[in-house]
Swiss-Prot record:
Subcellular location: Plastid, Chloroplast
The name this protein goes by in its record: Ribulose bisphosphate carboxylase large chain
Co-factor note (free text): Binds 1 Mg(2+) ion per subunit.
Record lineage: Eukaryota, Viridiplantae, Streptophyta, Embryophyta, Tracheophyta
Protein's organism: Liriope muscari
InterPro entries recorded: RuBisCO, RuBisCo_large_chain_AS, RuBisCO_lsu_C, RuBisCO_lsu_C_sf, RuBisCO_lsu_fd_N, RuBisCO_lsu_N_sf, RuBisCO_lsuI
Amino acid sequence: KASVGFKAGVKDYRLTYYTPDYETKDTDILAAFRVTPQPGVPAEEAGAAVAAESSTGTWTTVWTDGLTSLDRYKGRCYHIEAVIGEENQYICYVAYPLDLFEEGSVTNMFTSIVGNVFGFKALRALRLEDLRIPPAYSKTFQGPPHGIQVERDKLNKYGRPLLGCTIKPKLGLSAKNYGRAVYECLRGGLDFTKDDENVNSQPFMRWRDRFVFCAEALYKAQAETGEIKGHYLNATAGTCEEMMKRAVFARELGAPIVMHDYLTGGFTANTSLAHYCRDNGLLLHIHRAMHAVIDRQKNHGMHFRVLAKGLRMSGGDHIHAGTVVGKLEGEREITLGFVDLLRDDFIEKDRSRGIFFTQDWVSMPGVIPVASGGIHVWHMPALTEIFGDDSVLQFGGGTLGHPWGNAPGAVANRVALEACVQARNEGRDLAREGNEIIREAAKWSPELA
């Protein structure tokens, strides 16, 4: 049998990388891949190929294999199950030894696990469904700059979801008019307003002007309402240096929160920004622009729950997580699955919610999920019920589309939210009586009517 190791030429991966009797270690990073092999490629070979190509393997035996201990460093495909209802599709479980990964680098983790292997010829399609991050690895990350509890304490807001609004039209306003829209929304009763993800520093509105006018709006609204307000100042830029410059300026203005597009900006930039935010008391709002490029295909790419876990390690205090009810895609149980992965400390394996592994975050701070995209006041009861208190509900057109203007739109949202929270606390069923609750509130709030 030993001769197999050193025959020249192409050899089967499963001889080395398919190990069904392997007992996973507590320190292993575990991955669940949805594998669709090419016709004629057996499942064991496909699963082993994934393990090999994402760890130590190459297409043949190289003599330098003799200079290391492959048994210590190789990824192993340790379990394969057929996907029910799909022809020729399998979930392959792969265990990676911890030593394969650089400490505190989400970038390195993804380069290994979802690198070259996705272009592999023997596979028709490949999707990373879930990752189990062991405490031994997650402890090398600082995670979110502040987390849910610290954010509530900073804002002095408890017992309800937070309200946000993306300023529209997303592109084309001057800085002064943009600041005016921010002021009106915050004055009306929202907690946050938001730069759109593609608002960076364009010719019609340079970043520094926007930051200054938004800060002015913030302070004015705070003085008039007696509440702490925030505007997500988008610091995303073409270089990391420029991004940090913007974050520094936001801090100098006394802004409470900045924002980053973490997939287009990259995990390296995101982790740098998160470290700065923690050191300087800034909250960090994360937008997931580009996620659907990676996660929308059912059989290829990467599920959003993996991107969400990566973000919790890299660092962010808010992240967009779909709505379940608005204009963008998202199934309820699956969405709630990764919302729990973002917020909770310990999440049990539950395949019905798409959770393939039990995940223990060992006290890493949580991330607040943001529901955003095509939602409006009539969704409020459902959103309050689905997402609970630790969430940000973000209404863009649902605020600015109010026939009377921005401030009344904000008032309507705040009234609807307070009504839903009060009804829930009184024990009423939001799912069943939602519309009725909003209608009752509308009787004494002309903005909501």
